[in-house]
């Protein structure tokens, strides 16, 4: 199976490390290595996400200047939108409506259970790959 690339977005290096540990556990389940791209805010995350097209994006709600909600809106609203899974880690459960509004596929309230995060990411990445496999060859995006 091909390598999986995940973009981690947070101004906090410790938060990115925790995300990396949680997400890194999906390697065995997806049958291939996981590599990480990192951004410290939503603006940088949007640039990297649109340029690199990772398999998934995991963003901390407190992703400073342009936060996770803005990041998701920017990725979804771009001229060539990012269609992969976006997961937002929330500080408060009351912000779930913002995650939904922004176009996130999933959200978790801190503290995040790393197994739940990994399970959801695997589910979304496998679903995306199944859809791509079922798409006629002439309609597939070349990477």
PLM region descriptions:
Residues 39-56:
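Acidic, metal-coordinating helix/loop segments flanking the phosphotransfer/catalytic sites
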Residues 80-85:
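His-Asp phosphorelay/catalytic-motif detector in bacterial-type signaling
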Residues 122-138:
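The C-terminal output helix
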Residues 55-75:
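Conserved phosphotransfer microenvironments
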Residues 70, 88-107:
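Alpha4 helix (beta4-alpha4-beta5 surface) of REC/receiver domains from two-component response regulators
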Residues 31-40:
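Short hydrophobic/Thr-rich beta-strand motif most characteristic of the beta2 strand and flanking loop
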Residues 3-24, 57:
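Conserved acidic segment of CheY-like receiver
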Residues 18, 112-121:
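C-terminal output helix
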């Amino acid at each position: 199976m091909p390598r999986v690339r995940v973009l981690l977005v947070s101004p906090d290096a410790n938060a990115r490390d925790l995300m990396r540990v949680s997400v890194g556990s999906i390697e065995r389940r997806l049958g291939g290595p996981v590599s990480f791209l990192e951004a410290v805010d939503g603006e940088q995350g949007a640039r990297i996400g649109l340029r690199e097209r990772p398999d998934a994006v995991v963003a901390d709600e407190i992703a400073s200047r342009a936060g996770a909600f803005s990041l998701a809106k920017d990725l979804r609203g771009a001229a060539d939108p990012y269609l992969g899974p976006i997961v937002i880690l929330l500080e408060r459960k009351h912000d779930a409506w913002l995650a939904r509004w922004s176009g996130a596929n999933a959200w978790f309230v801190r503290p995040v259970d790393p197994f739940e995060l990994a399970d959801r990411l695997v589910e979304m990445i496998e679903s995306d790959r199944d859809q791509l496999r079922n798409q006629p060859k002439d309609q597939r995006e070349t990477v």
